[in-house]
Amino acid sequence: MVAHGIAAWVAQPIRHALLKVAADSLIAGGLYYCSYNTLPGWLAACPLQQLAWLESRRRASGTTSAAQAVHAAAATLQGLLGLAETPSALAMALPGLRERLGSLKEMDSSYLVQEYINEGWQPLTVQDFHDSAMAHKLRYTASAALPDNFPGLLPVNIRDTVMAEADPLVREVLQDLAINQSFRRDIFSRGVDTLSSAENTALLQAMHFCLQEAPEQESYPFTTSFGLVNGNSNLYRSVETILADGPMSFAVLQDRLSLSIPDLAQVLSLLLHDGRVGIDRGEAGKAATSACNSVNKTLSRLQLNGRPYNFRAAAPIGSAVPFSIAEALLETAAENSGGSDHREALIKGLDALGRTLVDTPEAVMEAYQQRRYRLQKLELGRS
């Protein structure tokens, strides 16, 4: 079961009901994914949400939009921060608040309303939510943000303190505090883990991986919630070179690279996190191609009508890949006019949607042409 972006935006009784529904619906060993805003990362946003909610309530009978209430609250808070050279007590206590307020003008209005104009808005702590989940026999298993499962990737100055903690829940708390965690993507399992270590290893070694979108690069920096992680270029390039020949199992990769299971799991997790590698679904992926093509056709139509859908379903990996509105316009232009210049179609399409490019049309078209072959391998068709 999946509950993405719900738990921290609803009242406590509804949050407990979500957990109960998950627990009652899953068989033993079934998985429940739940993502939510968390503390301490959202502390700086608390004053903004408080004022935005009050502003929206005060303006409820007027004609201004809910998004305007958020911007009005932000303007008021700016006046409470003082100057950068002479910050107020609030600005010193919440140094991230000024930057957050400055970023609002770049955010979509629908997101601002959904995020801040919400009576049930309440960033959660990991210990409180995990305790609530355990009360429903939902046991924390792992983070869907794969790098978060490897505390050895933490910066050196905080790593030892986190890894020295033996209690799993306390270790999660320490990790969240150390990195100022703002959003968790937790996976829970129903009941107890019935797999032995040998069974877990066998399942892992049988998994197959494939090259996804992996343009050549000299270095391997990975942006994670721990900060920037720099991978060993020779090692990561070797993995991609092997996978360029086609999908490979974990066991084969381990043998060819002479890596331990934990080390290879970390390498693959970072490549998966960065979208350079995918989990190959084999025959199941082939069987899902037609359905994914149908979904992509609908997503394309909605995207071209201005809806905020910026991903496409990729059947071979059972996941989604980014696909911008500019790429959707160029894809449609190519289907309608073959190999002619699509610059005009791109510009007109963006103008009609009230959108602009951050780069030149020529650069965007060149990037799309370079990406088309990689996308074709992922079978991102529309039928």
Show where each model-derived region lies:
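A short glycine-rich, Lys/Arg-flanked "PGG" loop and its adjoining helix->strand segment in the class I
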Residues: 15-29
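Short secondary-structure boundary/capping segments
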Residues: 16-18, 46-55, 150, 155-160
